[in-house]
Amino acid sequence: HAYDAYMREYLKMALEWLGSTRTPVILLSATLPESQREEMAKAYLKGWRNSKLELPSEAKRGGIQELKRRQLAAKNEKVYVNEPKLVQERGISSVHKVSSAYPVLTYTSDTEIKHMDVKPSGRSMNVRCQIVDDSDEALISLLDRLLEDGGCVGVICDTVGRAQHAAKLLSDYFGSEYVKLTHSRFMDIDRMSNEAELRQLLGPDSTVGNGERPQRMIVVGTQVLEQSLDIDFDTLVTDIAPVDLIMQRLGRVHRHRRGNNECDRPSLLREAACYIRGIAFWNDNGPEFAKGVDAVYDVASLMESLAVLELTGSSAFCTQCLPKDIARTVRNAYGNDVRSLVPTAWNMQYDKGCEERANKQEKKRADAHSYLIQSVAVMNRKRSLVDWFSPQIDETDDDKGQRAVRDTQDTVEVMLLCKHDGEVCLLPWIGDKRNGIERGAVIPVDTVPCDDVAKVAAQCSVRLPVALCAHGRIDSLIAALEEGCGTEAAYWQESPWLAGKLALFLHEDAEKHLSSDELCGYTISYSRGDGLTYTKKEDN
């Protein structure tokens, strides 16, 4: 789900080329909108149609279809195949109407796009979704009530800043031993450790009975909690987000069965619930979103999410039946009739948001084509690698092509290391016991570090916040980092693990806090519990 209008252009071109080479592709998503499924399938078939490879014979194609049916039948799954009248569009056939079932399998057959309804797993649940106030006091009060008898709650925030603020707030009230924080501003090695710990504590095999699952725990994080982690919360608090992401987040509530009728969960948390915050206040003409939330997601998409879920007031609530409601809810949010679901009083603000979103997406699509390879059809005509890329990268922007796949603001990745008594070291808790690297080990600067030390140092990488790189400051930031490395990094360029990497040296004060010298008007701090934080010089 790390894609947007910009990255989709790259994804479609990749699918087109994979189609041209007859390469099977599987895309898995619980919440992919119908229009995007169709868009991706058409991109694949566009390449398939323009391929120069020999098409399989009718007999072979029939054998493949029969094999598919036999494989499904062998699993004793009752499969419903929807094959209504096909609509021809530029050589590609597509079903006229997609089934409303969930799950649904979309697949290509020669030049046709087809859909197959697959029987659900059998487990379903109702999740009560409710709007709550965005204030600090409301968050503390809510969790204080919910965790009266214990339990494990997830708090998903849309920005790292909101997550760090919530974690500190909750740590101060409930105690830091009950609160864990995870987000993208942890060093790679710490982030992997955080996620491994969460899987151990909240995974399918951890229970209160076997001593693995905590009696009480609050996990605060960003979107990393909605992606790939097989963890299970007793209840969830989340910032508002586009509806497909809300559905992803709901999948972390009561993800695994905990006894008959969830009897192994605390009594107050046996009914699945999700509390949605991130709305600063409600105006007559629509919601005003909290600072930072509308910087991550388009206002129009957030309003559509609220409208589709019928959460249109400060005390609104609804019930979602999972997985049955996923397809319908996502389809409504991304369908052509979504405006009719938005309250009339919101229309002015919503229309403005739609216009801003459309302009932004059009710019993203146009920007993506600057460094997109040529289509299969064009290459079939020109047949020259020289023509594969249309743009020319000049010396002033020779790395733009490498950055182009993700439409993110330019930022810089650094290794966080510690300077102590004139030596460069790993951070105090960082080491590799398996390979004999002690915590806080010294990294040599007068010789090439051995591979074991260099690999650990390379895993101490993190991206600096966008704020440090804004307004064209990235060149001066890189220059300051290079100057800060001085001669310490000279021998590191001979290491395949460290060559070309920038380092930011932190210093430990009397209270064991790690922070940098001033860097382009900012001070960078890092801790094992909070990750990377930064303050402007005038804020110090």
Name each model-derived stretch.
Residues R37, N126, Q130-D133, E137-Q200, ...:
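C-terminal helicase lobe and adjacent C-terminal extensions/tails of nucleic-acid helicase motors
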Residues A2-A5, R128-D134, P214:
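Short, flexible loop segments at the rims of nucleotide/cofactor-binding pockets, characterized by
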Residues A2-Y6, L15-L45:
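Conserved helicase ATPase motor motifs in RecA-like P-loop NTPase domains
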Residues P24-S29, M217-T222, Y275:
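Structural recognition of the conserved hydrophobic beta-strand(s) that form the central parallel beta-sheet
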Residues G209-E226, T238:
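Conserved two-lobed SF2 helicase motor
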Residues A30-E38, L53-L55, D264-P266:
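Short, glycine/acidic-rich hinge or "gate" loops at secondary-structure transitions
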Residues H1-A5, P33, R162, Q227, ...:
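Residues immediately C-terminal
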Residues T23, L27, G47-D158:
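Conserved interdomain linker/interface between the two RecA-like ATPase lobes of SF2 helicase motors
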